[in-house]
């Protein structure tokens, strides 16, 4: 049997936002790029909905497109276990991290289209089944529609999600410990009665052990209703907690599900190594996720952009060693890693709080004046109202 061999400068495995961004910037840098994804349709099945900040999109040079935006947010409502709520809306405070709710299926596909327009080739329903080191890169075994073939690449970029097989094949340990893997479950629901359809709602405490629950408005009476939990904090599955939350939350008590999504988020920060000879790891595969919010689209895409730029330069220079690719890791630590490390400390602190302590913080927030609201500003206010938080987090913020 004759095995076809395709040769490329850069092979990106996984066409999520991080992988597509890596492919785009490697192609813009002049590299011959191939982007492969195991799914027959990029973006499907839908990942859990997520918000992105306007500033985050701008930093990546991405113009908002109404095709992949379901809602522009005007604020947040945070609800403690006893129902005490804190409203932070754009009519009262500045929201520098305000942004959009994405239609992930469409957004992911559009990011892949951007990669194609930049010059990257794309193959769908194509799975990498193994790879071996060569003198100047990797030989990757792949399969598409039952046809086996090989791809010879100077650089492989692993964007294949949490528990990356590609990184493992290259000898990198990117495995996520159970205590750092958040299990998530989400319904898209109709008949949701939110207090403000332009605000995202967060619910904290034992409703979602180790994480939080949220209602994300999409329009009219439609919302994504989901939560994330840590298996080390509960004996129940994320789905079981979701069913309980839907029954207990006034906004969703009379709503009906039309779609269910299940997934996982690595919330333990980036692994010690992101590169090896001829290999870089990006996105969820690299733990480029905010441990506090579980959001990883913008941070993963920033990682993808840096990886693509470094890959193109390395190929052009004829040096694809780990030392040369280490520029990507250094830039990631500077531009993404410091923030991830800070928010990991905040998450670890929040895990120590009981429901009654969360209620006390929410009640203290009732008397706090906010001029602007961002994740960092919220933590700073938390430090002001909680002596325990000051002791644990004061030096970080």
UniProtKB/Swiss-Prot annotation:
Pathway(s) annotated for this protein in UniProt: Membrane lipid metabolism; glycerophospholipid metabolism
Catalytic activity: a 2,3-bis-O-phytanyl-sn-glycerol 1-phospholipid + 8 A = a 2,3-bis-O-(geranylgeranyl)-sn-glycerol 1-phospholipid + 8 AH2; 2,3-bis-O-(phytanyl)-sn-glycerol 1-phosphate + 8 A = 2,3-bis-O-(geranylgeranyl)-sn-glycerol 1-phosphate + 8 AH2; CDP-2,3-bis-O-(geranylgeranyl)-sn-glycerol + 8 AH2 = CDP-2,3-bis-O-(phytanyl)-sn-glycerol + 8 A; archaetidylserine + 8 AH2 = 2,3-bis-O-phytanyl-sn-glycero-3-phospho-L-serine + 8 A
Record's keyword terms, sorted: FAD, Flavoprotein, Lipid biosynthesis, Lipid metabolism, Oxidoreductase, Phospholipid biosynthesis, Phospholipid metabolism
Entry keyword annotation includes Mitochondrion: no
EC number: 1.3.-.-
Signal peptide: none
Cofactor comment text: Binds 1 FAD per subunit.
Enzymatic class: oxidoreductase
A Pfam family it matches: GGR_cat
Cellular component annotations (GO), alphabetically ordered: membrane
Residues at which FAD binds: 18, 37, 48-49, 51, 104, 128, 284, 296-297
Cofactor(s), by name: FAD
Gene Ontology annotations of biological process type: glycerophospholipid biosynthetic process; membrane lipid biosynthetic process
GO MF annotation terms: flavin adenine dinucleotide binding; geranylgeranyl reductase activity; oxidoreductase activity, acting on the CH-CH group of donors, NAD or NADP as acceptor
Transmembrane segments: none
UniProt-listed HAMAP family: DGGGPL_reductase (MF_01287)
Comment field (misc): Reduction reaction proceeds via syn addition of hydrogen for double bonds.
Family membership: Belongs to the geranylgeranyl reductase family. DGGGPL reductase subfamily.
Matching PANTHER family: DIGERANYLGERANYLGLYCEROPHOSPHOLIPID REDUCTASE, GERANYLGERANYL DIPHOSPHATE REDUCTASE
Function recorded in the entry: Is involved in the reduction of 2,3-digeranylgeranylglycerophospholipids (unsaturated archaeols) into 2,3-diphytanylglycerophospholipids (saturated archaeols) in the biosynthesis of archaeal membrane lipids. Catalyzes the formation of archaetidic acid (2,3-di-O-phytanyl-sn-glyceryl phosphate) from 2,3-di-O-geranylgeranylglyceryl phosphate (DGGGP) via the hydrogenation of each double bond of the isoprenoid chains.
Protein known as: Digeranylgeranylglycerophospholipid reductase 1
Native organism: Methanothermobacter thermautotrophicus (strain ATCC 29096 / DSM 1053 / JCM 10044 / NBRC 100330 / Delta H) (Methanobacterium thermoautotrophicum)
């Amino acid at each position: 049997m004759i095995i076809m061999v395709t040769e490329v400068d850069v092979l990106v495995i996984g066409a999520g936002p991080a992988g597509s961004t890596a492919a785009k910037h490697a192609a813009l840098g002049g590299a011959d790029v191939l982007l492969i994804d195991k799914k027959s349709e990029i973006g499907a099945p839908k990942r859990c909905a997520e918000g992105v900040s306007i500033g985050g999109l701008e930093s990546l040079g991405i113009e908002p497109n109404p095709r992949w935006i379901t809602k522009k947010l005007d604020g947040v409502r945070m609800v403690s276990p006893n129902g005490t709520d804190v409203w932070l809306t754009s009519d009262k405070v500045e929201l520098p991290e305000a942004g959009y709710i994405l239609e992930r299926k469409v957004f992911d596909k559009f990011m892949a289209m951007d990669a194609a327009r930049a010059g990257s080739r794309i193959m769908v329903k194509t799975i990498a089944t193994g790879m071996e080191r060569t003198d100047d890169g990797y030989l990757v075994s792949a399969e598409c529609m039952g046809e086996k073939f090989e791809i010879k690449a100077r650089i492989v970029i692993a964007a294949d999600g949490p528990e990356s097989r590609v990184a493992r094949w290259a000898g990198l340990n990117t495995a996520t410990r159970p205590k750092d893997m958040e299990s998530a479950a989400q319904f898209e629901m109709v008949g949701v009665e939110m207090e403000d359809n332009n605000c995202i709602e967060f619910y904290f405490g034992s409703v979602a052990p180790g994480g939080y629950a949220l209602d994300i408005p999409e329009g009219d009476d439609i919302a994504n209703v989901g939560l994330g939990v840590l298996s080390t904090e509960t004996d129940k599955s994320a789905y079981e907690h979701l069913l309980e939350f839907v029954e207990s939350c006034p906004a969703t008590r009379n709503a009906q599900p039309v779609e269910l999504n299940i997934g996982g988020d690595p919330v333990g920060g980036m692994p010690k190594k992101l590169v090896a000879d001829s290999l870089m790891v990006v996105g969820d595969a690299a733990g480029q996720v905010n441990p506090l919010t579980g959001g990883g689209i913008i941070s993963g895409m920033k990682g993808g952009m840096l990886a693509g730029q470094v890959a193109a330069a390395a190929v052009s220079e004829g040096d694809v060693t780990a030392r040369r690719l280490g520029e990507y890791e250094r830039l990631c630590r500077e531009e993404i890693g410091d923030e991830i490390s800070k928010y990991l400390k905040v998450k670890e602190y929040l895990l120590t709080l009981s429901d009654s302590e969360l209620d006390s913080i929410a009640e203290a927030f009732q008397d706090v004046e906010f001029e602007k609201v961002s994740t960092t500003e919220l933590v700073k206010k938390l430090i002001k109202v909680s002596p325990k938080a000051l002791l644990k987090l004061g030096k970080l913020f």
